[in-house]
Amino acid sequence: MLAKRIIPCLDVRDGQVVKGVQFRNHEIIGDIVPLAKRYAEEGADELVFYDITASSDGRVVDKSWVSRVAEVIDIPFCVAGGIKSLDDAAKILSFGADKISINSPALADPTLITRLADRFGVQCIVVGIDTWYDGETGKYHVNQYTGDETRTRVTQWETLDWVQEVQKRGAGEIVLNMMNQDGVRNGYDLEQLKKVREVCHVPLIASGGAGTMEHFLEAFRDADVDGALAASVFHKQIINIGELKAYLATQGVEIRIC
Protein backbone atom coordinates (compact mmCIF):
# COMPACT_ATOMS: atom_id res chain seq x y z
CA MET A 1 0.00 0.00 0.00
CA LEU A 2 1.32 3.43 -0.93
CA ALA A 3 1.70 5.88 1.92
CA LYS A 4 -0.96 8.58 2.15
CA ARG A 5 0.27 12.11 1.49
CA ILE A 6 -0.06 15.34 3.45
CA ILE A 7 0.15 18.29 1.08
CA PRO A 8 0.22 21.95 2.14
CA CYS A 9 -1.24 24.25 -0.49
CA LEU A 10 0.19 27.70 -1.09
CA ASP A 11 -2.01 30.08 -3.09
CA VAL A 12 0.22 32.72 -4.67
CA ARG A 13 -0.78 36.20 -5.77
CA ASP A 14 1.59 39.06 -6.57
CA GLY A 15 4.54 37.06 -5.27
CA GLN A 16 3.07 36.32 -1.85
CA VAL A 17 1.13 33.47 -0.28
CA VAL A 18 -2.53 34.35 0.32
CA LYS A 19 -5.58 32.51 1.63
CA GLY A 20 -9.28 33.11 1.16
CA VAL A 21 -12.56 31.55 2.22
CA GLN A 22 -14.59 29.83 -0.52
CA PHE A 23 -12.13 31.34 -3.01
CA ARG A 24 -12.89 34.93 -1.92
CA ASN A 25 -11.53 37.71 0.30
CA HIS A 26 -7.89 36.64 0.28
CA GLU A 27 -5.57 37.77 3.05
CA ILE A 28 -1.78 37.86 2.83
CA ILE A 29 -0.11 35.00 4.71
CA GLY A 30 3.58 35.60 4.01
CA ASP A 31 6.52 35.07 1.69
CA ILE A 32 6.67 31.99 -0.51
CA VAL A 33 10.15 30.59 0.12
CA PRO A 34 10.20 30.67 3.96
CA LEU A 35 6.79 29.00 4.10
CA ALA A 36 7.85 26.31 1.64
CA LYS A 37 10.97 25.62 3.67
CA ARG A 38 9.01 25.43 6.92
CA TYR A 39 6.53 22.91 5.56
CA ALA A 40 9.28 20.73 4.13
CA GLU A 41 11.03 20.73 7.50
CA GLU A 42 7.78 19.88 9.32
CA GLY A 43 7.42 16.73 7.23
CA ALA A 44 5.14 17.59 4.31
CA ASP A 45 5.18 14.93 1.59
CA GLU A 46 4.91 17.48 -1.18
CA LEU A 47 3.77 21.05 -1.80
CA VAL A 48 1.32 22.55 -4.26
CA PHE A 49 1.60 26.14 -5.45
CA TYR A 50 -1.32 27.84 -7.20
CA ASP A 51 -0.76 31.17 -8.91
CA ILE A 52 -4.44 31.89 -8.42
CA THR A 53 -4.90 34.81 -10.82
CA ALA A 54 -2.70 33.58 -13.68
CA SER A 55 -5.50 32.04 -15.75
CA SER A 56 -8.00 34.83 -15.14
CA ASP A 57 -5.27 37.40 -15.95
CA GLY A 58 -4.38 35.57 -19.15
CA ARG A 59 -0.75 34.92 -18.15
CA VAL A 60 1.39 32.00 -17.07
CA VAL A 61 2.61 31.41 -13.52
CA ASP A 62 5.38 33.76 -12.40
CA LYS A 63 8.43 31.55 -12.81
CA SER A 64 10.85 33.67 -10.77
CA TRP A 65 9.98 32.03 -7.46
CA VAL A 66 9.80 28.45 -8.78
CA SER A 67 13.57 28.05 -9.00
CA ARG A 68 14.02 29.64 -5.57
CA VAL A 69 11.66 27.09 -4.04
CA ALA A 70 13.50 24.24 -5.78
CA GLU A 71 16.74 25.40 -4.19
CA VAL A 72 15.50 25.24 -0.59
CA ILE A 73 13.28 22.13 -0.41
CA ASP A 74 14.00 18.46 -1.06
CA ILE A 75 10.42 17.20 -1.46
CA PRO A 76 8.35 17.13 -4.66
CA PHE A 77 6.31 20.17 -5.56
CA CYS A 78 3.61 20.95 -8.09
CA VAL A 79 2.97 24.31 -9.76
CA ALA A 80 -0.27 25.58 -11.31
CA GLY A 81 -1.33 28.79 -12.93
CA GLY A 82 -2.20 29.64 -16.52
CA ILE A 83 -0.23 26.77 -18.10
CA LYS A 84 -1.68 26.69 -21.62
CA SER A 85 1.07 25.13 -23.73
CA LEU A 86 3.83 22.54 -23.83
CA ASP A 87 6.35 25.37 -23.71
CA ASP A 88 4.81 26.83 -20.54
CA ALA A 89 5.00 23.43 -18.85
CA ALA A 90 8.54 22.73 -20.05
CA LYS A 91 9.81 25.99 -18.59
CA ILE A 92 8.22 25.39 -15.19
CA LEU A 93 9.54 21.83 -15.02
CA SER A 94 12.99 23.05 -16.08
CA PHE A 95 12.99 25.48 -13.15
CA GLY A 96 12.68 22.54 -10.75
CA ALA A 97 8.99 21.73 -10.35
CA ASP A 98 8.21 18.00 -10.26
CA LYS A 99 4.62 18.28 -11.49
CA ILE A 100 2.46 20.79 -13.25
CA SER A 101 -1.25 21.21 -12.63
CA ILE A 102 -3.82 22.54 -15.05
CA ASN A 103 -7.36 23.60 -14.31
CA SER A 104 -9.06 26.40 -16.26
CA PRO A 105 -6.86 25.90 -19.36
CA ALA A 106 -7.90 22.23 -19.47
CA LEU A 107 -11.55 23.27 -19.48
CA ALA A 108 -10.87 25.70 -22.31
CA ASP A 109 -8.94 23.08 -24.30
CA PRO A 110 -9.24 19.49 -23.04
CA THR A 111 -6.73 18.28 -25.65
CA LEU A 112 -4.06 20.09 -23.61
CA ILE A 113 -4.20 17.28 -21.05
CA THR A 114 -3.30 14.65 -23.65
CA ARG A 115 -0.58 16.74 -25.26
CA LEU A 116 1.07 17.36 -21.89
CA ALA A 117 0.80 13.71 -20.85
CA ASP A 118 2.27 12.53 -24.16
CA ARG A 119 5.18 14.96 -23.88
CA PHE A 120 6.07 14.76 -20.19
CA GLY A 121 4.41 11.56 -18.93
CA VAL A 122 1.22 11.13 -16.96
CA GLN A 123 3.16 10.99 -13.68
CA CYS A 124 3.70 14.75 -13.67
CA ILE A 125 0.33 15.90 -15.08
CA VAL A 126 -2.20 16.89 -12.42
CA VAL A 127 -5.67 18.20 -13.20
CA GLY A 128 -7.26 20.47 -10.62
CA ILE A 129 -11.05 20.52 -10.49
CA ASP A 130 -12.89 23.35 -8.74
CA THR A 131 -16.24 21.84 -7.81
CA TRP A 132 -19.27 23.60 -6.34
CA TYR A 133 -22.30 21.90 -4.83
CA ASP A 134 -25.58 23.45 -5.98
CA GLY A 135 -28.08 22.89 -3.18
CA GLU A 136 -31.03 23.67 -5.45
CA THR A 137 -30.23 21.01 -8.04
CA GLY A 138 -28.36 18.61 -5.78
CA LYS A 139 -25.55 18.43 -8.34
CA TYR A 140 -21.83 19.16 -8.35
CA HIS A 141 -20.65 21.51 -11.07
CA VAL A 142 -17.16 22.41 -12.27
CA ASN A 143 -16.19 26.09 -12.07
CA GLN A 144 -13.61 27.96 -14.14
CA TYR A 145 -11.41 31.03 -13.53
CA THR A 146 -11.95 30.79 -9.78
CA GLY A 147 -8.87 32.88 -8.97
CA ASP A 148 -10.84 36.04 -9.80
CA GLU A 149 -14.30 36.12 -8.25
CA THR A 150 -15.48 38.63 -10.87
CA ARG A 151 -14.68 36.16 -13.65
CA THR A 152 -15.60 32.85 -12.01
CA ARG A 153 -18.09 30.95 -14.12
CA VAL A 154 -19.99 27.69 -13.84
CA THR A 155 -19.14 25.40 -16.75
CA GLN A 156 -21.33 22.90 -18.58
CA TRP A 157 -19.51 20.05 -16.86
CA GLU A 158 -20.86 18.14 -13.92
CA THR A 159 -18.01 17.11 -11.66
CA LEU A 160 -18.28 13.34 -12.01
CA ASP A 161 -18.38 13.60 -15.80
CA TRP A 162 -15.32 15.85 -15.89
CA VAL A 163 -13.41 13.53 -13.54
CA GLN A 164 -13.95 10.71 -16.01
CA GLU A 165 -13.14 12.87 -19.02
CA VAL A 166 -9.77 14.08 -17.74
CA GLN A 167 -8.70 10.53 -16.93
CA LYS A 168 -9.48 9.44 -20.49
CA ARG A 169 -7.33 12.30 -21.73
CA GLY A 170 -4.28 11.41 -19.64
CA ALA A 171 -4.52 13.02 -16.20
CA GLY A 172 -2.12 11.24 -13.85
CA GLU A 173 -3.64 12.70 -10.69
CA ILE A 174 -6.71 14.71 -9.72
CA VAL A 175 -6.99 17.39 -7.05
CA LEU A 176 -10.62 17.92 -6.10
CA ASN A 177 -11.02 21.48 -4.80
CA MET A 178 -14.37 21.50 -2.98
CA MET A 179 -15.27 25.18 -3.09
CA ASN A 180 -18.15 25.06 -0.60
CA GLN A 181 -15.74 23.80 2.06
CA ASP A 182 -12.76 25.98 1.16
CA GLY A 183 -11.28 27.78 4.15
CA VAL A 184 -14.20 27.12 6.52
CA ARG A 185 -12.44 24.25 8.33
CA ASN A 186 -15.53 22.12 9.02
CA GLY A 187 -14.31 18.99 7.25
CA TYR A 188 -13.89 17.63 3.76
CA ASP A 189 -17.03 16.86 1.73
CA LEU A 190 -16.89 13.11 2.30
CA GLU A 191 -20.06 12.40 0.34
CA GLN A 192 -18.65 14.06 -2.75
CA LEU A 193 -15.25 12.43 -2.29
CA LYS A 194 -16.82 8.98 -2.08
CA LYS A 195 -18.74 9.57 -5.31
CA VAL A 196 -15.63 10.80 -7.08
CA ARG A 197 -13.55 7.92 -5.70
CA GLU A 198 -15.91 5.45 -7.37
CA VAL A 199 -15.07 6.82 -10.82
CA CYS A 200 -11.50 8.02 -10.19
CA HIS A 201 -8.85 5.41 -10.93
CA VAL A 202 -5.80 7.68 -10.61
CA PRO A 203 -4.49 9.20 -7.37
CA LEU A 204 -7.15 11.47 -5.84
CA ILE A 205 -6.27 14.41 -3.61
CA ALA A 206 -8.91 15.98 -1.34
CA SER A 207 -8.84 19.75 -0.99
CA GLY A 208 -11.08 22.10 0.98
CA GLY A 209 -12.37 21.90 4.52
CA ALA A 210 -9.64 20.54 6.78
CA GLY A 211 -9.93 21.95 10.29
CA THR A 212 -8.88 19.15 12.64
CA MET A 213 -6.68 16.07 12.55
CA GLU A 214 -9.85 13.97 12.52
CA HIS A 215 -10.86 15.54 9.22
CA PHE A 216 -7.71 14.17 7.59
CA LEU A 217 -8.37 10.75 9.10
CA GLU A 218 -11.94 10.73 7.75
CA ALA A 219 -10.77 11.58 4.24
CA PHE A 220 -8.24 8.74 4.24
CA ARG A 221 -10.35 6.16 6.06
CA ASP A 222 -13.85 6.88 4.74
CA ALA A 223 -13.20 8.20 1.22
CA ASP A 224 -9.94 6.37 0.48
CA VAL A 225 -8.21 9.43 -0.96
CA ASP A 226 -4.51 9.20 -1.73
CA GLY A 227 -3.61 12.59 -0.35
CA ALA A 228 -5.11 15.41 1.68
CA LEU A 229 -4.37 19.00 0.79
CA ALA A 230 -4.87 21.87 3.21
CA ALA A 231 -3.86 25.48 3.62
CA SER A 232 -5.24 27.60 6.46
CA VAL A 233 -4.73 25.00 9.22
CA PHE A 234 -1.05 24.89 8.31
CA HIS A 235 -0.60 28.59 7.55
CA LYS A 236 -2.13 29.60 10.87
CA GLN A 237 -0.30 26.81 12.73
CA ILE A 238 -3.53 25.24 13.95
CA ILE A 239 -2.10 21.85 12.99
CA ASN A 240 1.57 20.83 12.92
CA ILE A 241 2.34 18.43 10.10
CA GLY A 242 4.63 16.21 12.18
CA GLU A 243 2.04 15.89 14.93
CA LEU A 244 -0.68 15.21 12.35
CA LYS A 245 1.32 12.37 10.85
CA ALA A 246 2.01 10.86 14.25
CA TYR A 247 -1.72 10.94 15.01
CA LEU A 248 -2.64 9.34 11.68
CA ALA A 249 -0.09 6.58 12.25
CA THR A 250 -1.70 5.73 15.60
CA GLN A 251 -5.02 5.42 13.75
CA GLY A 252 -3.62 2.87 11.34
CA VAL A 253 -3.07 5.15 8.35
CA GLU A 254 -0.07 4.24 6.21
CA ILE A 255 1.95 7.45 6.35
CA ARG A 256 5.57 8.52 5.99
CA ILE A 257 6.98 9.53 9.37
CA CYS A 258 10.00 11.81 9.29
Curated annotation (Swiss-Prot):
| Listed InterPro entries | Aldolase_TIM, His_biosynth, HisF, IGPS_HisA/HisF, RibuloseP-bd_barrel
Q: Which GO terms describe its molecular function?
A: imidazoleglycerol-phosphate synthase activity; lyase activity
Which GO terms are recorded in the biological process aspect for this UniProt protein? L-histidine biosynthetic process
Task: Please name the pathway.
Answer: Amino-acid biosynthesis; L-histidine biosynthesis; L-histidine from 5-phospho-alpha-D-ribose 1-diphosphate: step 5/9
The UniProt keywords, alphabetically, are: Amino-acid biosynthesis, Cytoplasm, Histidine biosynthesis, Lyase
Q: Which domain of life is it from?
A: Bacteria
For this protein, the Enzyme Commission number is 4.3.2.10
Q: Does the keyword Cytoplasm apply?
A: yes
GO cellular-component terms in the record?
cytoplasm
Instruction: Kindly identify the residues recorded as the active site.
Output: D11, D130
Q: Kindly report, in one word, the top-level EC class recorded for this enzyme.
A: lyase
Question: Do you know which Pfam families this protein is assigned to?
Answer: His_biosynth (PF00977)
Q: Where in the cell is it found?
A: Cytoplasm
What reaction does this catalyse? 5-[(5-phospho-1-deoxy-D-ribulos-1-ylimino)methylamino]-1-(5-phospho-beta-D-ribosyl)imidazole-4-carboxamide + L-glutamine = D-erythro-1-(imidazol-4-yl)glycerol 3-phosphate + 5-amino-1-(5-phospho-beta-D-ribosyl)imidazole-4-carboxamide + L-glutamate + H(+)
Q: How does it assemble?
A: Heterodimer of HisH and HisF.
Report the function annotation for this chain: IGPS catalyzes the conversion of PRFAR and glutamine to IGP, AICAR and glutamate. The HisF subunit catalyzes the cyclization activity that produces IGP and AICAR from PRFAR using the ammonia provided by the HisH subunit.
Q: Which NCBIfam families match?
A: hisF (TIGR00735)
- Please state which protein family the record places this protein in: Belongs to the HisA/HisF family.
In Swiss-Prot or TrEMBL terms, this protein is called Imidazole glycerol phosphate synthase subunit HisF
Task: Provide the species name.
Answer: Escherichia coli O139:H28 (strain E24377A / ETEC)
Q: Which gene encodes it?
A: hisF
